[in-house]
Regions:
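Conserved acetyl-CoA-binding loop-helix of GNAT-fold acetyltransferases
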Residues: 81-94
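A conserved beta-strand-loop-helix scaffold within acyl/acetyltransferase catalytic domains
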Residues: 28-50, 55-67, 71-74
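C-terminal "cap" of GNAT-fold acetyltransferases
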Residues: 109, 129-207
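Conserved active-site alpha-helix within GNAT-family acetyltransferase domains
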Residues: 98-101, 109-133
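Conserved hydrophobic beta-strand within the GNAT/NAT acetyltransferase core sheet
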Residues: 70, 103-108
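Short amphipathic alpha-helix that is part of the acyltransferase structural core
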Residues: 1-35, 168-172, 183
């Protein structure tokens, strides 16, 4: 079961979490949400099992633009490798679909590409941190998202963003970003891994 989580509850989970990479990641996400005062406007969603928080999604939902902007997915330290990130993703997109959201966008780090490919994402550009930008219509399930992606390989107009978004994404090329040599190599390898789901060449069709 997933539900929105208040700031104090997440702070308590952080206080009780052992030191580790996931705890640092969750702390950074918590700080970001606090800094932008998003706990009031867009509270995170948390997956619970046996009344224990397992994973958390930080995202904004815009009724005006009909966009879901997903910032981070965090698994609580010690709960890795149990499928909690996939569970919260599936439940979260279903909730957003029921809220009449129409598109979802996010930036995917090179290290997360393998996991995100299982979510049915397509990719268009590279941000300043070397992450791959993803933006597509929101479907209710991962399977429907993957079905749409397969169709988009032959009909890219099915997933193209608006003209304004396409113009912005065209400017975000790997070659133009201020990345270190190591970052550039990691991002290049991620693009190769994405393969046919790297749809950058079709952005001009949206102009």
């Amino acid at each position: 079961m997933i539900k929105t989580v208040e700031e104090y509850a997440l702070k308590k989970t952080l206080a009780n979490s052992p030191n580790g990479r996931n705890t640092k990641f969750l702390q950074a996400s918590f700080s970001l949400w606090t800094r932008f005062k998003n706990f009031q406007k867009n509270p995170p969603y948390a997956l619970y099992e046996d009344d224990e928080m397992k994973s958390i999604i930080f995202a904004t939902i815009s009724k005006k633009s009909k966009y879901v902007n997903l910032y981070e997915i965090c698994t609580v330290q010690g709960q890795e490798g149990k499928g909690y990130a996939s569970k919260i993703w599936s439940e979260f997109i279903a909730i957003c679909f029921e809220k009449k959201m129409e598109r979802i966008k996010l930036s995917c780090t090179p290290s997360s590409i393998t996991w995100h490919l299982r979510n049915g994402l397509v990719f268009w550009a590279v941000d300043r941190q070397g992450s791959l930008r993803s933006d597509q219509p929101l479907m209710k399930t991962r399977e429907e998202q993957k079905e749409l992606r397969e169709k988009a390989i032959y009909e890219p107009q099915l997933v193209l963003p608006s003209k304004k978004v396409c113009e912005k994404l065209i400017q975000e090329a790997l070659e133009t970003q201020p990345l270190s040599q190591k970052q550039s190599i990691n991002t290049y390898n991620a693009i190769q891994q994405v393969g046919k789901y790297w749809l950058r060449n079709y952005l001009k069709n949206g102009l």
